[in-house]
Amino acid sequence: MADGNYGIVHQDSPDRRGIDVALLYRKDCFELLEADFLRLSFPEDTTIRTRDILYASGVLDSDTLHFFVCHFPSMIGGEKQSEWRRERAASTVRHKVDSLLAVQPRAGIVIMGDLNGKANTPAQKVLGTKSSDKKPRCKDLYNT
């Protein structure tokens, strides 16, 4: 990989297990424009420490793309009991997506990673994704 001209976007997250998110990219194919780590906070329970959400944008083949690299909070403590944490993560992503779409309605957005749930969970509903068999429309997110 050292010869591949790769770049990486990474920072240590507050996760106690040392799990982080990162974006690995080829510098000769993708021009990184911006990177930010969205910190998830849980004032209701300050003992919760989870992975940040990585937001990065860049240019690929003259198109600007926006990436969200996610590893939503785990189901520790039970799926239903911990769902609100994943909903908070989804809400954080959705808020940033909405702010991007307000400026650029046809923005190319990719949300990827481990969302710790199925397509029909409450957290997925917060994201507002639609089935990928629907006709694409601006400002919609699709599951694939």
Predicted regions and their residues:
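Extracytoplasmic/periplasmic, Sec-exported soluble proteins
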Residues: 1, 12-16, 45-48, 81-89, ...
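Structured beta-strand-rich core segments of catalytic domains in phosphoester-bond hydrolases
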Residues: 1-64, 72
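Short, well-ordered secondary-structure micro-motifs
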Residues: 4-5, 79, 121-124
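A residue-level signal for conserved active-site and pocket-lining positions in enzyme catalytic cores
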Residues: 24, 67, 114
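Secondary-structure boundary elements
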Residues: 30-31, 58-66, 95-106
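Active-site His/acidic residue clusters
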Residues: 63, 68-85
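Metal-dependent phosphoesterases centered on the DNase I-like endonuclease/exonuclease/phosphatase
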Residues: 86-144
